[in-house]
Each structure stands twice: as structure tokens, then as C-alpha cells.
């Protein structure tokens, strides 16, 4: 079958093999990428696509993806197969769960180099960033699940009430069934495998749909999952919109989606048809409020780490904008400039430690933000672009118009607007004027301001005096609130999001009181009222026909 790939997919795919995606003629789609006198084959196992390339500025082409047909019928058969295997009880045992988790850990250890290469092909992600942000985080989550799985699976004993005496009660976790994980392109390994770890630990059958915009990672995940995991209950489906649509038309026991709000609405609408519960890991405009009493160098370094050293700003928890006072702004900007040069050199566009923009579409989106009326003249640092390499230098802007798209939309790139206020407390109103973000950051030594920030700022998560690190704490839930998402995961929260907590009450055949059965009499009512009010003395009096007032 010839699959028509999205333009973004093709552009990303071309760049992964060293061909400039910036000159693609997007006016014609589908299109053929051709060259006089021959073609080329992407032999890398991570990207199984046959392409023909060109030397010309204007290109047109069809890309043939070497993949099997995947229609609604195939999707239905897949879900039926996985549900049958789930219903057999195969995934519910501790032995199956632990073996699959151990296989994931082994996969990460044995294929770390392949994973790193795929992340570089898709995003030019530096090796150390790939290890810290994706590989080590995923391995850590897997090892925690292996260590704690027996404890997580154990029933939780809870208290019973006097009305059920004698009895005992437990909360028993059970797997939901067959679940769908749809992941994002910006951290394509972490955001694919981490929720799958939770789904497996909870005993589910799972289908992973990786993002087609990160084709090298998508192809690698399909290859590795088929090699390391139980394919009768764990599958990867590659593809774009048609494949995702076919999957969403099926009945799932849960859908876990990481991505943007626009697609999330489509996911929710599809899930509503079958009353399927969803987890939506989205994003938003994550603010960093910077007080004037901070260690300026440390604050600047940590803001950079949570912006440009975090996939070049293409992160849902990355710093989207900074708020500080008018008097302090120039000092903060100078500190950021100094540390940016230390991190990325005088020409950041040539730095190997700065990821590229994922594809031409997102590059153009960011470029248009910079060129918007009233924005370009607000640049105080950076603003350099290189379209052929899909790179934008770390860019700082001061007091861009509130009505600009840069302040109304999630930036998701290396542009950092700084908004100034008279008093640092005025920053709270700026944050509250926007939808609730996935993360919010505060830099201060003022404990009262810190307390107020935690109490008054509604966000998925908060880090004080740093950025993004809260997501590495596995005992903290990671998820959004409001428009930044629904539900949470990481650590035990991943296990719980893919589990149903079933309440179970155990009773014997003894202690069968007549009080609960007809005929209902005034005496029974007196005794039951006393019992339900936990007044044992009154219950005894009522049992013998006396009221507590007699």
C-alpha cells in the first residue's frame, strides 16, 4: 500500500537523513521528491521508507511507506485479539507483569545507542540531553515499577463500620483491560514508554501509537517492542491521522494521550462515544515568576535549563514566559545572556547542544510569531534563524504585546518573552489571566511569597527555585489541571491511572441481625439510629426497650 504521509512527517523524515526539508513545495500534496539520474533508499532500520531526493529548490513527490494496510477493520481485529488474550487472564499475573517490565529495562540497557541515534535523527537531540531527559527517566520509572510491583498489587485493608459487623474490607486493584497510548513527538521515547510501563504494571493489554512526526523513534519503538515484549498483548501501530482515526473508532478501556489541546478535543469526542475514560497530558503557557532577591546566576542557569536546554523549548513543562519587576528585568536579561553564551557559545546556531525545531511547519509557526507586528522590535537577544537547519537561536523578548500570538498561544520553541510588572505580586494576576498551565515556577527567597504562590497559583505542578525537576520525583503526580490536562501518572500514579480500585467487603454467615429486615418497628428504628450515631450505650438501651432520656 502507498500511504500518504503528512507533510510534517515527510519533512522530519527528510531531515533525519540529512536532506533539507525547508525547500519542500507544500503547495502540492501528495508530492514526489525526485532527482535527475536516480534516487536513494533510507537504509537505516529506524526509518523504513523509500525516498527519492532532489537538488532543486522546488520539489514535488509521493512518498511510499513500506507498511501494511491498517484500516478500521484491521484495528477492530487487533483490539479483539488483544481483548481475547486479556480475558484469558494472561496479563493479570505478577509473573507476566514483572517479566515484561524486566524486558523493558533490558531493552533500554541493550539499545541505548539506538535510542540516542533515533532521538538525534528526529530532533538533533544532544546525547546527554537524550540520556537525562528520556532514557534515564524511563529506566528509573521501570526499575521503580519492578521494585514496588508486589506492594502496588497487594490489596489494601480498610476499616469497616459497626453496621457491617462482623466483617473485613479491602481495596483491590484490577486492570482496566485493553488500553490505547497515543504519544507525542517532542520526547518520543519517554512519552511512549513511560505510560506503557504503567499499563503493563497494572496488568493491561496495550496498544502504543507513537507520533509520526518523530519517525525514527516511531520505527525504532515498533521494532524493539516486537523484539522484547509479548506481542500477543502489547503492540505498536505506526502511522498518521488515518491510523489514529481507525484506532479511535474502537472501544477501549482507557485512552492515554499526550499532545496538544486541539487533538485532545478530538480524542475526548471519540472516547465519549463509548464512555471511555481518558488521561490527557497537554501543556499550556508555563510561567516563571522571578523575584529580585534571588541568586541571579543560579536562577538564570535554571531558567535556561528549563527552556533552551529542554529540547530547545519544545517541552510541555518548559518555561513559556517569565514575569519579573521592571526594575529587575535588565539584570535578569544580562544574566541570561551571559549564561546562554557559556552554555551554547557566541553562535548558538552552531552549537551541538541545542536541539533543532522538529519540522518546517513548526519552524514557520515560530518564525511568524517573531515577525508579528509589535513583536520583532521587542527582541533584546537572539532572533537569528537558519531555515536549512531548522534552528532558531535562543531569543529573549521584553514586554511583547499581550494580544500577540506569542502571549496568547503556547510557544513551544526557543522564544522567551519577559513580562514586567510594578510589584512581583502583580505577576499573580498575569498568571491567572491565562488558562491553568501544566507547570509553574517561582524564584524567590521570600517564604511568604513562596507560600502565596503555592496556594494561589493553580497549575499541574510547581517547582520553587528551579524548573522542570518536579517531573523526576516519582512520588509526585504528573498531570495537568483545566486546559493543561486530565489525570496524572509517574511512579505509583501510573499504576493507579491504569487500574480500577475495586471495593470488596467480606462477611461470614454469622451475626445475622434481624434489625435490617422487615417488619420495621419503632424499636428497630431506635436501635439502628443509635448504632448509626455510634452511640453504643443508647443502642443497648434501645435494644431493651428504653430511650436514653427515660
UniProtKB/Swiss-Prot annotation:
Q: What CDD domains does the database record attribute to this sequence?
A: ALDH_F3FHI
- Transit pept. (range): 1-59
The record describes the dependence of activity on pH as: Optimum pH is 9.0.
Q: Which domain of life is it from?
A: Eukaryota
List GO BP terms, alphabetically: aldehyde metabolic process; response to abscisic acid; response to water deprivation
Name a Pfam family for this protein.
Aldedh
CC terms in the record's Gene Ontology section: chloroplast; chloroplast envelope; plasma membrane; plastid
Supply the SUPFAM superfamilies for this chain.
ALDH-like
Q: Catalyses which reaction?
A: an aldehyde + NAD(+) + H2O = a carboxylate + NADH + 2 H(+)
Q: Cellular location of this protein? A: Plastid, Chloroplast
Its induction note reads: By abscisic acid (ABA), dehydration, salt stress in plantlets. Induced by heavy metals and H(2)O(2).
User: How is this protein's activity kept under control?
Assistant: Thiol-based regulation. Inactivation after dimerization under oxidizing conditions.
Q: At which residues is there a site annotated Transition state stabilizer?
A: 186
Q: What is its EC number?
A: 1.2.1.3
The Swiss-Prot or TrEMBL record annotates one GO molecular function as: aldehyde dehydrogenase (NADP+) activity
Q: Which UniProt keywords apply?
A: Chloroplast, Disulfide bond, NAD, Oxidoreductase, Plastid, Stress response, Transit peptide
* Principal subcellular localisation of the protein: plastid
Q: What else is known?
A: Plants overexpressing ALDH3I1 show improved tolerance when exposed to dehydration, salt stress, heavy metals and H(2)O(2).
The text of the family note is: Belongs to the aldehyde dehydrogenase family.
Q: What does this protein do?
A: Involved in oxidative stress tolerance by detoxifying reactive aldehydes derived from lipid peroxidation. Medium- to long-chain saturated aldehydes are preferred substrates, while the short-chain aldehyde propanal is a weak substrate. Can use both NAD(+) and NADP(+), but the coenzyme preference is substrate dependent.
Self-association state and partner proteins as the record states: Homodimer and homomultimer.
The name on file for this protein is: Aldehyde dehydrogenase family 3 member I1, chloroplastic
Query: What organism does this protein naturally occur in?
Result: Arabidopsis thaliana (Mouse-ear cress)
